[in-house]
Amino acid sequence: ILPVDQGFEHGPARSFAKNEDGYDPHYHFKLAINAGLSAFAAPLGMLEAGADTFAGQIPLIMKVNSSNSLSREKYSPSQAITGSVSEAIRLGCSAIGFTIYPGSDAALDMISDIQDMALEAKSAGLAVVVWSYPRGGDISKEGETAIDIVAYAAHMAALVGAHIIKVKPPTSHIELEEAKKVYIDENILIDTLSNRIKH
């Protein structure tokens, strides 16, 4: 899946200035198609710019929530709803995509939002993709990719009904003291990336 929501998240210059073709939404459609990828995920406006032109050439995933780097959300990172199931259907999308931030003070609201949208999407025959990226609250920077935290984030995404889940590759760091004892006592293998992914 080629996800292109960087312009929303980080602004156009930081996202596309090194490759000016990236300013053109059609460039990203073509990149995903020519690379033989499984799908192209983007926010509403980018999909609207090319959905008709590239109809039927690659499955589309509408990213229905987004954040931006202008807001101050160190402890309570969140995302705004920026798309809808009806807009995804109108553009011929195969799925909706949603980001949650487990650990954020806003996480419970985000989980409620995706659960409601997932029900609507599934009722319309669309798949649900969840990007589950722990951050905020009491999670340290190292903890954002800790095995126990990433596993928890993936589990939460599965429990809200995601068909496809994206997490960052976990490190062998264990963030929570309560979890450390379980990993040791149960001899959970986390020595290699392969074992951590399997977990």
Each predicted region: which residue ranges?
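Alpha/beta enzyme core
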Residues: 5-199
